[in-house]
């Protein structure tokens, strides 16, 4: 089998194609969630706590000196990314819950399987022993 043919078969398998579609949709969904957090959720939240923009929260470790830029920890951006993560995680959780619910087949009551020959014989022996004990 040629290398190209083998690669084509690998790439066209259902799992690989499904994964590729999932990654592309996931990336697009991530952009939507980031916009939701940055443009919809964070501004009112900042307004509620005094008109603060979370992106501006930062802690300067070292001031800029000449050509050397300042060393700054932007923890406001981190807080915003935590909100992104929580929303994405919740959305994925809800999607998986929905998929599991749709995939769950109604369990039909199954009849008890017929007893095996061994079980039938053991039941007969048990019944005979009970009869003998009751006679005594």
Curated annotation (Swiss-Prot):
Pfam families according to UniProt: MscL
Membrane topology classification: Multi-pass membrane protein
Lineage top rank: taxon: Bacteria
Compartment(s) where it occurs, according to its Swiss-Prot or TrEMBL record: Cell inner membrane
Keyword flag Chloroplast: no
SUPFAM superfamilies: Gated mechanosensitive channel
Protein keywords: Cell inner membrane, Cell membrane, Ion channel, Ion transport, Membrane, Transmembrane, Transmembrane helix, Transport
GO molecular function, one term: mechanosensitive monoatomic ion channel activity
Recorded GO CC terms: plasma membrane
Isomerase keyword on record: no
TM stretches of this protein: 10-30, 76-96
Family: Belongs to the MscL family.
Subunit annotation: Homopentamer.
Annotated function: Channel that opens in response to stretch forces in the membrane lipid bilayer. May participate in the regulation of osmotic pressure changes within the cell.
Protein name as catalogued: Large-conductance mechanosensitive channel
Originating organism: Citrobacter koseri (strain ATCC BAA-895 / CDC 4225-83 / SGSC4696)
């Amino acid at each position: 089998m040629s290398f190209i043919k083998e690669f084509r078969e690998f790439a066209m398998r259902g799992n690989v194609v499904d994964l590729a579609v999932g990654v592309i949709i996931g990336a697009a969904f991530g952009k939507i969630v980031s916009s939701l957090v940055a443009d919809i959720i964070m501004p009112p939240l900042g307004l509620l706590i005094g008109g603060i923009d979370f992106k501006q929260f930062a802690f300067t470790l070292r001031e800029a000196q000449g050509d050397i830029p300042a060393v700054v920890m932007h923890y406001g951006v981190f807080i915003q990314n935590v909100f992104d993560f929580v929303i994405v995680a919740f959305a994925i959780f809800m999607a998986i819950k929905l998929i599991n619910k749709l995939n769950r087949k109604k369990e039909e009551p199954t009849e008890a399987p017929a007893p095996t020959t061994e079980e039938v014989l053991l039941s007969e022996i048990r019944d005979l022993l009970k009869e003998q004990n009751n006679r005594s």
